[in-house]
């Protein structure tokens, strides 16, 4: 298992007994200074905290933590380097709760003085370049799966939609999740009428996971609630780890088969009536039966 994010608080009780291998791809300290990565890691493999279960796959004994996001975000080069490192180190699941905010990038360029048309064109060119970059990388990893341990890339769909403002205000999945070969993840939340897509969750993801009000490890100790497709992604990564363990017993483990299991067993049971399949993909991922 590998988590590429803001790092991890290795002193948190949720990670007691876990063999954590860290590599820093930023210019900042090795430690998590934000809490985002710590929270995501807790959802994947965190041990119980004060009697509360937070980890989907708490039996994971070794993880690779790549710090690719700092105070100013992160770049594609660092993410690519981290993915290559994780693959070379034998990760079979790589969880990435990160992405490119296309509308936000356009606004940033406009703030820098670029006309709207030029800012949009520049952002689109960057978007396309990133999609192609991650598709080439995913294709390379898929080709390697026949020779080395499998690796499945899982990434957050993004949080730019605003269905709470307008039900039609839906933004498409952002890079790297939109790239072919990457399993994109949408977020769902619980309502009295059943589960529903989170208002912020981008549209067009392949699968979904819980992503609203998620309780997990807090930077410095304890637990805290967070929401986002960033929180849904580690749920899917944790379930992927459980499937990887099951498939490895029969010697069938490879990235494509792992993705097929996650998509093929995903379910829409419990979803609020009238849900749009485009919002949640195949449905919420399901752990394998014992």
Regions found by a protein language model. Give the residues of each.
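Flexible loop residues that form catalytic
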Residues: 99, 158, 187-190, 266
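Glycine/charged-rich beta-loop-alpha catalytic/anionic-binding loops adjacent to active sites
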Residues: 19-27, 217-222
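Structural detector of well-ordered beta-strand residues that form the stable sheet scaffold
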Residues: 26, 64, 152-154, 184-185, ...
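Substrate-binding/access-modulating region of protease and related hydrolase catalytic domains
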Residues: 68-175, 219-233, 274-276
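N-terminal domain-start motif of subtilase-like serine proteases
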Residues: 1-3, 23-32, 135-139, 143, ...
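Extracellular S/T/G-rich loop segment that most often corresponds to the catalytic His/Ser-adjacent loop
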Residues: 1-7, 13, 164-249
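Hydrolase catalytic cores
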Residues: 43-44, 66-69, 84, 211-280
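Subtilisin-like serine protease catalytic core
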Residues: 1-21, 28-77, 84, 89-92, ...
